[in-house]
């Protein structure tokens, strides 16, 4: 199954670079620059807009009607995550909605373009994003201290909404992996690798933001 193949990639250089990225390490340690975190929250909310649209486009095109309601619930969960970011962090830190960074713009454009491709491709990139986030948050759990100022972020991002989205997409992507041929499976792995690279670029952008002082302005 596709999820089993991906899970065997835990030690791959790209996934290791994501898990050990300074942004994620410092977030886990509670030492991350607050301006970098604010920039990340702003961009993550903008990213989720594109991710939600990708889910909804996929829902409208998916062949198996049994997957429609579960996928719609994943979209609903992602909307709840986005609302949490805006209601909680935007208020606490005075974050404005702003514009997409180049990394966020490229990532969401990639997702939306794939949503109009074959359905198995759309499901693959949606699952890849969930898988990578789960890998990162699972790795963080053992290192997070109760007094870490970012602990509510971890608690929410490793909570039931994300778990449901991950499990649902894993179930659907594995069904597609069984149905498609060898070439399509290779394409699924390629899409996972591309998604992981976009994720890495996203964290690079957040971590290096303060260095370049390029906080996108509000519309």
Roles of regions detected by a PLM:
Residues 7, 66-164, 193, 197, ...:
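Active-site-proximal alpha-helical scaffolds that flank and shape metal-associated catalytic sites
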Residues 164-193:
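Long amphipathic all-alpha helical oligomerization modules
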Residues 62-68, 181-182, 186:
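Structural helix-adjacent loops and short alpha-helical linkers that scaffold large soluble proteins
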Residues 189-219:
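Acidic, carboxylate-rich catalytic segments that either coordinate divalent cations
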Residues 39-50, 73, 77, 187-194, ...:
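A non-catalytic, amphipathic alpha-helix used as a structural packing/dimerization or gating element
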Residues 13-17, 31-61, 124-134, 203:
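Alpha-helical bundle segments that constitute or directly flank the non-heme di-iron/ferroxidase center
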Residues 58-62, 114, 137-144, 176, ...:
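Secondary-structure edge/capping motif, primarily at the C-terminal ends of alpha-helices
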Residues 7-32, 51, 170-179:
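Short alpha-helical hairpin
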């Amino acid at each position: 199954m596709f999820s089993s193949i991906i899970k065997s990639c835990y030690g791959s250089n790209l996934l290791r670079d994501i898990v050990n990225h300074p942004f994620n390490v410092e977030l886990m340690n509670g030492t991350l620059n607050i301006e970098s975190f604010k920039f990340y929250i702003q961009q993550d909310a903008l990213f989720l807009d594109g991710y939600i649209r990708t889910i909804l486009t996929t829902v409208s095109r998916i062949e198996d009607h049994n997957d429609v309601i579960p996928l719609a619930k994943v979209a609903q969960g992602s909307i709840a995550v986005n609302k949490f970011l805006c209601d909680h962090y935007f208020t606490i830190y005075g974050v404005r909605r702003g514009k997409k960074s180049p990394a966020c713009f490229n990532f969401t454009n990639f997702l939306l373009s794939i949503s109009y491709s074959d359905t198995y491709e759309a499901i693959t990139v949606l699952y890849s994003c969930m898988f990578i986030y789960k890998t990162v948050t699972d790795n963080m759990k053992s290192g997070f201290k109760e007094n870490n100022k970012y602990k509510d972020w971890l608690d929410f991002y490793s909570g039931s909404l994300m778990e449901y989205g991950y499990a649902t997409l894993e179930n659907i992507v594995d069904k597609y992996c069984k149905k498609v041929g060898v070439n399509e499976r290779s394409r699924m792995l390629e899409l996972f690798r591309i998604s992981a690279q976009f994720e890495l670029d996203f964290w690079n952008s957040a971590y290096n933001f303060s260095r370049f002082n390029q906080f996108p302005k509000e519309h």
